[in-house]
């Protein structure tokens, strides 16, 4: 996993913690709180392609299966 993916994973995990593991709600939370991230976190996440973000989400959701 790249540094950028780790930043994104940590961000999504923060959202999941707020919603008891609900991935869908966590992604909404992430969208609503994106501007509150530091510049370096936003830049790292913005560098990710859709495929790279999906890889992170896939990894997180496989834990619950």
What are the residue ranges of the model-derived segments?
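The feature represents the first ordered module of a protein
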Residues: 1-38
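Short, compact, well-ordered microdomains
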Residues: 43-65
């Amino acid at each position: 996993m790249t540094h950028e993916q780790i930043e994104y994973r940590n961000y999504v995990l923060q959202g999941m913690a707020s919603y008891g593991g609900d991935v869908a709600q966590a992604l909404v939370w992430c969208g609503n709180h994106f501007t509150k991230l530091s510049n370096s976190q936003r830049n790292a996440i913005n560098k990710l392609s859709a495929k790279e973000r999906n890889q992170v989400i896939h990894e997180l959701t496989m834990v619950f299966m």
